[in-house]
Amino acid sequence: MSTDNDRAQYLRGALYGLMAVVIWSGWIVVARLGLRTSLTPWDIAALRFGVAGVLLVPYLARKGIAVERLGWSGLAAIVLGGAAPVFLANFGLKFAPAAHAGALFPGVMPLFVALLAAAFLQEDFTKSKKLGFALIMPGVVAIAWGPGESLASSQNIGDVFFLAAGLAWAFYTIAMRKARLGGLHAAAISAVGSMLIYLPVFAFMPGTTLASVSWTDVALQAIVQGVLTAILSLMLYGRAVSILGASSGAAFAALCPAMTALLAIPILGEWPTPIEWGAISLISAGVYVVSGGPLSWSKR
């Protein structure tokens, strides 16, 4: 890429990716807050799938499930790859802090996407991508296990959930890119499919606390989970992937640990340590390189 048009395309894709990152970072904080109430991971998943599924049924009825483009395996990757991370991340948050979620779910997911894209989409794992990931990974580790963090066994359980969530999301990304689905179309297939599969099971599940939780807590989760995260962020993410490619578009997710740390300043009054500021700088530089920033175009 070297023309002004290419630069404009990159900036458009980067803007979509950055907006998605802001929503994802907020989702991690809000999900953690929800789990501090009597809401369970099952309740939060029901709110996400129920709200998003109902809102997107009319759109999916017009567009269809695109099985001719996805194939049955691709359809399964979209539905399950969109649903599984919700459960995996929410259960992980029961064991490990939000910083680990941000670092190991969206933070490591771009590496999974790059490896799968090289295998299934023939996207080159270029020198610039290798350099970018070499910058991102130390930053992710520094935020997750910096000073004051430990490798407690219970946290390790949560970390495994977060990594599994990232891998599931990577399969969603590859299926969407391979079928060239729009972000909203993929979000609709995932949301409606998840709603049809999950809500009948949830209706007979013991231990739900939705009826006893304050309406403000329920409304917050419904809006953030069902509208912002399950619909808007997937639209933005899909646009970034369609413009920049699977691995380059997904690279913006690695900014989530840094964005979460920055959001914690005004929301939680938690200031990053000097090491975390350094990690934020490393991650930001790595994402810029992997995503195809102008200075790396000549090396791709």
Predicted segments — roles?
Residues 20-28, 57-106, 114, 142, ...:
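Specific transmembrane alpha-helical segments of multi-pass solute transporters/efflux pumps
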Residues 1-45, 148-178, 196-197, 263, ...:
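Glycine-/small-residue-enriched transmembrane alpha-helix faces in small-molecule transporters
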Residues 34, 44, 48, 92, ...:
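Hydrophobic/aromatic residues within transmembrane alpha-helices
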Residues 56, 77, 128-147, 198, ...:
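Hydrophobic transmembrane alpha-helices of multi-pass small-molecule transport proteins
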Residues 11-16, 42-58, 72-76, 130-138, ...:
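Hydrophobic alpha-helical transmembrane segments of multi-pass integral membrane proteins
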Residues 43-54, 81, 90-124, 165, ...:
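Specific alpha-helical transmembrane segments that line the substrate/conduction pathway
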Residues 47, 86, 101-108, 175-196, ...:
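Helix-helix packing/entry segments at the starts of transmembrane helices
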Residues 29-38, 94, 144-155, 203-222, ...:
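Membrane-interface helix termini and inter-helical loops of multi-pass transporters
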